[in-house]
Amino acid sequence: MAWRGWAQRGWGCGQAWAASVGGRSCEELTAALTPPRLLGRRFNFFIQQKCGFRKAPRKVEPRRSDTGTSGEAYKRSALIPPVEETVFYPSPYPIRSLIKPLFFTVGFTGCAFGSAAIWQYESLKSRVQSYFDGIKADWLDSIRPQKEGDFRKEINKWWNNLSDGQRTVTGIIAANVLVFCLWRVPSLQRTMIRYFTSNPASKVLCSPMLLSTFSHFSLFHMAANMYVLWSFSSSIVNILGQEQFMAVYLSAGVISNFVSYVGKVATGRYGPSLGASGAIMTVLAAVCTKIPEGRLAIIFLPMFTFTAGNALKAIIAMDTAGMILGWKFFDHAAHLGGALFGIWYVTYGHELIWKNREPLVKIWHEIRTNGPKKGGGSK
């Protein structure tokens, strides 16, 4: 669930200001100068007020080093990213702001699937060598004294008992936990807002489309997303395979953020978003499309079960209604974009993209076998 950022901030005043405006009280001056606050879930932009009096010259204050803001600036709910220190201004040409994200989405998706195809080739090649290495290792283990109660042995046992899907998403979960910890560092707040929240009104448009997929400010938000990803990990990896799943997941994060950009530009509701929900919606939609008769249940209400197909229809209907009615708590455009991409990929995309990877794999095989061609003239 990609969260919208919001903040509210007022202006203070001093005795010198009250004297310069004809004896108006500090409270009256504050009310007159206070810009529109950022209310609700929508990130509204500050509008500069025009005043009918001359303002006293401002004292030049020494520039503070960017070592973070005061603790008061971030005393807020754990669900709300501290965005009051960063103001985003919408482009006067909003459609143009989508050109770079569009090219980035297409280019990144192509690179993701190309890298996954090469990764699969290398994995298959290494399995043959690993097979013989495994035989040798088993023989050495049989004659080597075994350590009982060794912590490393217990970790290896736990890891070996995981499914391929669970092993794959363990790395994704670790990355999300790392980014969550970075949000807790005050000196990194500006960097996190700039690069780990996606917003078409920001100066940085492309890299946040990927990085925000691993970004969660709320512990509950991250825990809920990672639980859903863990629950569907075995099914999706059994359907797609490890390498193809990673390409789909990363591409889904970028594609869902691009759909979010389009929705924000179309409605004018700008605001930073973050979270893995767009990519997770792709995983959920792909599994529910492939296994529509599978039974699902809610974590705290296991007595109520429903089919995967019905669950997918309900989620799409809710996100569509959220977009039309302007619900602001979730980024419904990102959710809907991720779900539609998941449905499209398992229905058509696998045939169009993954099964046509052979030319790229052959080129890579020739490079690995013969090495790069040497230039120059004849010997």
UniProtKB/Swiss-Prot annotation:
Reaction(s) the record says it catalyses: Cleaves type-1 transmembrane domains using a catalytic dyad composed of serine and histidine that are contributed by different transmembrane domains
Originating species: Pongo abelii
EC numbers, comma separated: 3.4.21.105
Topology in the lipid bilayer: Multi-pass membrane protein
Biological role: Required for the control of apoptosis during postnatal growth. Essential for proteolytic processing of an antiapoptotic form of OPA1 which prevents the release of mitochondrial cytochrome c in response to intrinsic apoptotic signals. Required for the maturation of PINK1 into its 52kDa mature form after its cleavage by mitochondrial-processing peptidase (MPP). Promotes cleavage of serine/threonine-protein phosphatase PGAM5 in damaged mitochondria in response to loss of mitochondrial membrane potential.
Record keywords: Hydrolase, Membrane, Mitochondrion, Mitochondrion inner membrane, Nucleus, Phosphoprotein, Protease, Serine protease, Transit peptide, Transmembrane, Transmembrane helix
Primary location class: mitochondrion
Mitochondrial intermembrane compartment residues: 122-167, 231-244, 293-295, 355-379
Protein name: Presenilin-associated rhomboid-like protein, mitochondrial
GO molecular function: serine-type endopeptidase activity
Gene3D superfamilies in the record: Rhomboid-like
PTM annotation (Phosphothreonine): residues: 69
Subcellular location(s) of the protein: Mitochondrion inner membrane
SUPFAM superfamilies recorded: Rhomboid-like
GO CC, any one term: mitochondrial inner membrane
Organelle targeting sequence: 1-52
Membrane-crossing segments per the record: 102-121, 168-187, 208-230, 245-262, 274-292, 296-318, 333-354
InterPro entries xrefs: Peptidase_S54_rhomboid_dom (IPR022764), Rhomboid-like_sf (IPR035952), Rhomboid_protease_S54 (IPR050925)
Catalytic-site annotation from UniProt: 277 (nucleophile), 335
Residue numbers on the Mitochondrial matrix membrane side: 53-101, 188-207, 263-273, 319-332
Modified residues (Phosphoserine): 65, 70
